[in-house]
């Protein structure tokens, strides 16, 4: 009798061990499944176009995103803010980048677009280093771009004719510069180039040349960024509103962002990217700004 009882107890113990093992295997399988789900990578194709001022930022972020998500393909094209707004409105691209609010562009149905402000960019008047000028007043800047001051010697610089280098009317960089540097005054005729990289090269290669560039293009000594009324074109001065020439970097979608577009925009606005790529590329995180602006240019 005792022998039978012992056998029964051993069988029960064995059964309990098997049941426990099965339970652990089930939990392990579930855990592995949840882990795989959490590590799911983004995939698909995304086309972005627009602002050349934003291009260095978006390119750098897209490259890192694709490194982390090998099945995602992101194409970043420039063309200017007007192009970005038009193409996203037409559905030709999923994201349209712009230095200006959609409300500021004629022919754009701003109500159909959703604004994702991913950064702030400062812009500066940039001159050929041989001009001999590093700081001018805002009034002098307006006189240069409206053709009233024609030689750098009038400002204490070298005896060199001033050559203006402008962006086309579709450019958000031009719109921002005209609005906040020139107080709405239209620039005089000069060289007009669509690409910020080309503008920088012309300024660097042409004695007496002056144009305007986003801070993201002012990363070396090939051109000189001018201070305005003693205020240097630096991120900290943009953040406080002391330096006036800046713009939000808008990434617009037609309706709410979905799929890969949403994943990339969330990535671009994440704290990790804002504190690394955004600042490394010469932009300012929106969260660092002590002032705000609306579509009418009102600062508060």
From Swiss-Prot:
It is found in: Cell membrane. The keyword Membrane applies. It comes from Bacillus subtilis (strain 168). Residues 27-47 are annotated as: Disordered. A lipid is attached at residue 22 (N-palmitoyl cysteine). The complex is composed of two ATP-binding proteins (PstB), two transmembrane proteins (PstC and PstA) and a solute-binding protein (PstS). One of its GO terms (molecular function) is phosphate ion binding. Residues 1-21 form the signal peptide. Belongs to the PstS family. Residues 27-42 have a biased composition (Basic and acidic residues). GO terms for cellular component: plasma membrane. Part of the ABC transporter complex PstSACB involved in phosphate import. GO terms for biological process: phosphate ion transport. InterPro entries: PBP_domain, Phos-bd, Phosphate_ABC_transporter. CDD domains: PBP2_phosphate_like_1. A lipid is attached at residue 22 (S-diacylglycerol cysteine). Disulfide bonds: none annotated. The gene is pstS. Pfam families: PBP_like_2. This is Phosphate-binding protein PstS. It is a lipid-anchor. Its main location: membrane. Keywords: Cell membrane, Lipoprotein, Membrane, Palmitate, Phosphate transport, Signal, Transport.
């Amino acid at each position: 009798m005792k022998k039978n009882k012992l056998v029964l107890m051993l069988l029960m113990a064995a059964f309990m061990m098997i049941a426990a093992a099965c339970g652990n295997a089930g939990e392990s399988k579930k855990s592995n499944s949840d882990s795989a789900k959490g590590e799911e990578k983004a995939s698909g194709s995304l086309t972005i176009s627009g602002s050349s001022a934003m291009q260095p930022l978006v390119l750098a972020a897209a490259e890192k995103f694709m490194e982390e998500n090998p099945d995602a393909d992101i194409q970043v094209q420039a063309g200017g803010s007007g192009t970005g707004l038009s193409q996203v409105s037409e559905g030709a691209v999923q994201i349209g980048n712009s230095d200006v609010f959609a409300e500021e562009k004629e022919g754009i149905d701003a109500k159909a677009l959703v604004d994702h402000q991913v950064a702030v960019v400062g812009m500066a008047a940039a001159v050929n280093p041989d001009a001999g000028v590093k700081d001018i007043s805002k009034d002098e800047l307006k006189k240069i771009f409206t053709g009233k001051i024609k030689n750098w010697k009038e400002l204490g610089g070298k005896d060199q004719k001033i050559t203006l280098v402008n962006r086309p009317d579709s450019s958000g960089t031009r719109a921002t510069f005209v609005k906040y540097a020139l107080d709405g005054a239209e620039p005089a005729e000069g060289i007009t180039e669509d690409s910020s990289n080309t503008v920088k090269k012309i300024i660097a290669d042409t004695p007496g040349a002056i144009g305007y560039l986003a801070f993201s293009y002012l990363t070396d000594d090939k051109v000189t960024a001018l201070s305005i009324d003693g205020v240097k074109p630096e991120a900290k001065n943009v953040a406080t509103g002391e330096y006036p020439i800046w713009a939000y970097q808008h990434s617009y979608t037609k309706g709410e962002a979905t799929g890969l577009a949403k994943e990339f925009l969330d990535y671009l606005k994440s704290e990790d990217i804002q504190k690394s790529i955004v600042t490394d590329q010469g932009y300012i995180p929106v969260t660092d700004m002590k002032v705000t602006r609306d579509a009418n240019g009102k600062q508060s």
